[in-house]
Amino acid sequence: MITLPEQLEKLSKQENLIAQGAESLVYSAQHPYLPQQECIVKYRPKKPYRLPELDAQLSKHRTLAEARVLQKLALGDVEVPHLVFIDAKNGLIYMEKIEGLSVKQWIWNEEGDTEGGAQEAGDKSRSLPDGDVSSLKDTLVLVGQEIGKLHKSDIVHGDLTTSNVMLRDGKPVIIDFGLASVSTLAEDKAVDLYVMERAVLSTHPVHSQQYCDWLFEGYLAVVGKSQKEVMRKLEDVRQRGRKRSMLG
């Protein structure tokens, strides 16, 4: 059973748990300083299988690391949720609530696939309506640009998917930096791009190649020749992925 810190236990009785992952619980709660606004509270619960001292140390370290990443990116003009408050001892991060759809859901809406994932990868007969193409391209190019700014800041997300990019007033905001790390390595950034590429293939199979082309168009417009090594490494990562698929 998950034991919540006292302040979060009070919130959880009246507010909503909106997401639950392997490492954290995410709540929508009242903003601590602006009562008329909501914010997001991310909580890393205790792991009963760890030694308590080690668990507390890891939770504090990861909470502080995520907060530092958010602060670094905000200062670097990358669109991410603004930090509101952190309680590293209890594994809590309060941050801005981004109002809008995930890019995944937005694409499904644009495709007319409200159930999500209903299209099959082999169904090539379904083309995008003319009016949607411009909107899809413009938005995915913007997403690629935001990823480019992320990597130029030497931050690797660790779980780049269309679920972890929100659209606020049509502009992308990258969320969920629980697996993020600082890295200057082209290999790490290439793996980040590969994860996004595979996510697009999985959740938007019919037009995945076109969507990825637009993402990379935006990415390269930001990083330019400075990240040419990243794209070369991406091809290496793809080849390793194909080999693993063949070997099962």
Swiss-Prot record:
Active site as annotated: D159
EC number: 3.6.-.-, 2.7.11.1
PROSITE patterns tied to this protein: PROTEIN_KINASE_DOM (PS50011), PROTEIN_KINASE_TYR (PS00109)
UniProt keyword Phosphoprotein, yes or no: yes
Domain Protein kinase: from-to ranges: 12-248
GO biological process terms held by the UniProt record: positive regulation of transcription by RNA polymerase II; telomere maintenance via recombination; tRNA processing; tRNA threonylcarbamoyladenosine metabolic process
Region Disordered, annotated ranges: 113-132
Chain's role: Component of the EKC/KEOPS complex that is required for the formation of a threonylcarbamoyl group on adenosine at position 37 (t(6)A37) in tRNAs that read codons beginning with adenine. The complex is probably involved in the transfer of the threonylcarbamoyl moiety of threonylcarbamoyl-AMP (TC-AMP) to the N6 group of A37. BUD32 has ATPase activity in the context of the EKC/KEOPS complex and likely plays a supporting role to the catalytic subunit KAE1. The EKC/KEOPS complex also promotes both telomere uncapping and telomere elongation.
Family: Belongs to the protein kinase superfamily. BUD32 family.
Subunit structure: Component of the EKC/KEOPS complex composed of at least BUD32, CGI121, GON7, KAE1 and PCC1; the whole complex dimerizes.
NCBIfam families the UniProt entry points to: arch_bud32
Domain comment in the entry: This protein is considered an atypical serine/threonine kinase, because it lacks the conventional structural elements necessary for the substrate recognition as well as a lysine residue that in all other serine/threonine kinases participates in the catalytic event. BUD32 has protein kinase activity in vitro, but in the context of the EKC/KEOPS complex, the catalytic subunit KAE1 switches the activity of BUD32 from kinase into ATPase.
Protein known as: EKC/KEOPS complex subunit BUD32
Primary gene name: BUD32
